[in-house]
């Protein structure tokens, strides 16, 4: 029984920040058109929403701001973890590219994403995907069932988490210690880019295949998260606008 309760608590930590979960299969656009996600100050207006992870954890503080004429989000975590989430149904086969930027003033000194006791990051961008959960292992289905009972929400079929790592090389895929259906991909490593805005363009379909060995199902939503609840440290993360983009036209 204690083992089941510990498993429920571990997976419950992952469920709330994927509050993008939808009933049934999301409606998808027939053709590819770029999609700029709403500005961060659209929270509560069909835009972004703050999602706590647990009543036992402090919340990361998220504050929309303006910098260089654009909408950004400033996240401040002090022994804290929570997320800023936006529901966004999309088909990675038709609109495969995810573009965003972020800036961190400093790394989380003791963070190590391979160690569940030190698994923090100054910047994360998280993407949830739908899929057929009956194909998952019995153990994973039990974890998801426990998570639903604990949180009142379904968990996504799979989750990609783009992170800034202290030491793992860019391109490294790190399995989560909490769930086989969550994989972290390192897109920035070390202190070389600290203090500067860093820009990213990731192919969701390719990254999903790299992490899970299959084509992705529909995208359910996106979240950003700065967390320090495991290292009890303080960190900041500044997030620029998020965009879903199309492949370049043939010949360009």
Residue spans for each PLM region:
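N-terminal secretory signal peptides that target proteins for export/translocation
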Residues: 1-11
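Bacterial N-terminal signal peptides
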Residues: 12-25
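Extracellular carbohydrate-recognition regions
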Residues: 29-55, 138-143
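Short carbohydrate-recognition loop motifs
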Residues: 60-82
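Secreted extracellular polysaccharide-interacting domains
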Residues: 75-95, 106-110, 179-188
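Extracellular/luminal beta-rich ligand-recognition
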Residues: 120, 124, 130-178
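Extracellular beta-strand ligand-recognition surfaces/modules
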Residues: 122-125, 180-190, 194-232
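Extracellular beta-strand elements of beta-rich domains used
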Residues: 222, 242-244
């Amino acid at each position: 029984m204690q083992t089941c309760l510990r498993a429920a608590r571990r997976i419950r930590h992952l469920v709330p920040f994927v509050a993008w979960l939808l009933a049934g299969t999301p409606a998808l656009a027939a053709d590819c058109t770029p999609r700029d996600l709403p500005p961060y100050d659209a929270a509560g207006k069909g835009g972004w929403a703050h999602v706590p992870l647990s009543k036992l954890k402090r919340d990361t503080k998220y504050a929309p701001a303006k910098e260089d004429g654009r909408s950004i989000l400033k996240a401040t975590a002090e022994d804290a973890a929570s997320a800023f989430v936006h529901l966004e149904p999309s088909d990675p086969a038709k609109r495969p590219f995810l573009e965003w930027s972020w800036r961190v003033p400093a790394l989380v000194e003791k963070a190590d994403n391979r160690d569940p006791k030190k698994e923090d990051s100054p910047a994360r961008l998280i993407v949830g995907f739908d899929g057929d959960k009956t194909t998952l292992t019995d153990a994973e289905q039990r974890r998801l069932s426990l998570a639903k009972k604990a949180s009142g929400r379904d968990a996504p079929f799979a989750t990609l988490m783009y992170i800034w790592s202290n030491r793992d090389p860019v391109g490294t895929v790190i399995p989560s210690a909490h769930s086989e259906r969550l994989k972290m991909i390192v897109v920035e490593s070390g202190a070389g880019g600290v203090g500067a805005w860093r820009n990213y363009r990731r192919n969701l379909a390719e990254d999903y295949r790299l992490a899970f060995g299959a084509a992705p199902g529909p995208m359910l939503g996106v979240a950003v998260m700065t967390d320090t609840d495991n290292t009890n440290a303080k960190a900041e993360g500044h997030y620029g606008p998020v965009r879903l983009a199309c492949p370049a036209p043939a010949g360009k």
